[in-house]
Amino acid sequence: MKRSSFWLLIIFLITGTIYYYTVDNFSTTGNSIKKIEVLVIRAIDGDTLEIEGGERVRLLGINTPEKKEFYANEAINFTKQLENKTILLEIFDTDKYGRELGYIFLNNKLFNEEILKNGYAHFYSYEEDKYSNQLKKAESSAREKELGIWKKSENFGCLTLLELKFEEDGNRCTNKEKLTLQNTCNTLNVSIKDDATHIEHVLIKSGLYEKNYSCTWNDAGDTLFIWDKTGLLVFERY
């Protein structure tokens, strides 16, 4: 082998090794996936963890109640069982906050699924993946059993959704979103929430209820949750 060819081969091998090490083992963006065993330091909330090294992990496929919302304490207490335990973390991506996005396995069980099964979260996903159907089935089971956030109020059935309009003209935040409900019961003291973190507390009197919104309802279609003052489900559009 000529000397020049020999050195070209060496350079190629070194470059390929560096590329493999960098892309396959460190990148967590796009379609890159990796599995690692990590120690959980603490549960920040029901769907966010701090792991060894100070990194944060956001559990994919679920959305648990935020602090001060109904069942927020139950959700975080459920997730606290991961503290000081070594788990298998399957990373799919990293979000804009620098959090690892992924799925957690403890004792060979998908923890994201366990939260849904117990009714401490609802299914929430920007993009379908290999676990989506599994998570949807877990959520359906909790809904049928009326566990956690799915436990129904005695006033469930009082409200009928007549309209949930988003801003169709593409101009965001112009107060053209509209929610219209029909209440066949007495005045209801409720909390209204969308698929994200928008929540408000209102009184819905008997009869027609209408309200305009801005920058709230998802243009691609949104969920609507309504709970009574004790945290029981009054209405859902899901």
Roles of regions detected by a PLM:
Residues M1-Y238:
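Small beta-barrel nucleic-acid-binding modules, primarily SNase/OB-fold domains
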